[in-house]
């Protein structure tokens, strides 16, 4: 694909960007380079590659653990707690 002034102007309009005249040739070169990379990717032969779409994530067994004193230990570290909650200064009036 050839990057010409008409295509660059269309891309400017679609992206709502303005490319200064002194940068247009540089941008055209960069876009041509990017399109070259994309064409190389499309040219790759991928039909022999194995897809990994059927992989599943191994899950661990859920093992509930009873830790009744954890909340009490955490709240005991704070000076201000009430009814099993932290008490913090009011910030919204």
From Swiss-Prot:
<dbReference type="InterPro" id="IPR003837">
    <property type="entry name" value="GatC"/>
</dbReference>
<comment type="subunit">
    <text>Heterotrimer of A, B and C subunits.</text>
</comment>
<keyword id="KW-0067">ATP-binding</keyword>
<comment type="similarity">
    <text>Belongs to the GatC family.</text>
</comment>
<dbReference type="Pfam" id="PF02686">
    <property type="entry name" value="GatC"/>
</dbReference>
<keyword id="KW-0648">Protein biosynthesis</keyword>
<keyword id="KW-0436">Ligase</keyword>
<dbReference type="InterPro" id="IPR036113">
    <property type="entry name" value="Asp/Glu-ADT_sf_sub_c"/>
</dbReference>
<dbReference type="GO" id="GO:0050567">
    <property type="term" value="F:glutaminyl-tRNA synthase (glutamine-hydrolyzing) activity"/>
</dbReference>
<dbReference type="GO" id="GO:0006450">
    <property type="term" value="P:regulation of translational fidelity"/>
</dbReference>
<dbReference type="GO" id="GO:0005524">
    <property type="term" value="F:ATP binding"/>
</dbReference>
<comment type="function">
    <text>Allows the formation of correctly charged Asn-tRNA(Asn) or Gln-tRNA(Gln) through the transamidation of misacylated Asp-tRNA(Asn) or Glu-tRNA(Gln) in organisms which lack either or both of asparaginyl-tRNA or glutaminyl-tRNA synthetases. The reaction takes place in the presence of glutamine and ATP through an activated phospho-Asp-tRNA(Asn) or phospho-Glu-tRNA(Gln).</text>
</comment>
<dbReference type="GO" id="GO:0050566">
    <property type="term" value="F:asparaginyl-tRNA synthase (glutamine-hydrolyzing) activity"/>
</dbReference>
<dbReference type="GO" id="GO:0006412">
    <property type="term" value="P:translation"/>
</dbReference>
<keyword id="KW-0547">Nucleotide-binding</keyword>
<protein>
    <recommendedName>
        <fullName>Aspartyl/glutamyl-tRNA(Asn/Gln) amidotransferase subunit C</fullName>
        <ecNumber>6.3.5.-</ecNumber>
    </recommendedName>
</protein>
């Amino acid at each position: 694909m050839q990057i010409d002034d008409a295509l660059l102007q269309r891309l400017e309009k679609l992206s709502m960007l303005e490319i200064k005249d002194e940068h247009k040739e540089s941008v055209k070169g960069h876009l041509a380079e990017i399109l070259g990379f994309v064409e190389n990717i499309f040219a790759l032969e991928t039909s022999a590659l194995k897809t990994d779409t059927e992989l599943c994530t191994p899950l661990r067994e859920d093992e509930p653990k009873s830790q009744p004193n954890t909340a009490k230990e955490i709240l005991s570290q704070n000076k201000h707690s009430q009814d099993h909650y932290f008490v913090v200064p009011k910030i919204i009036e």
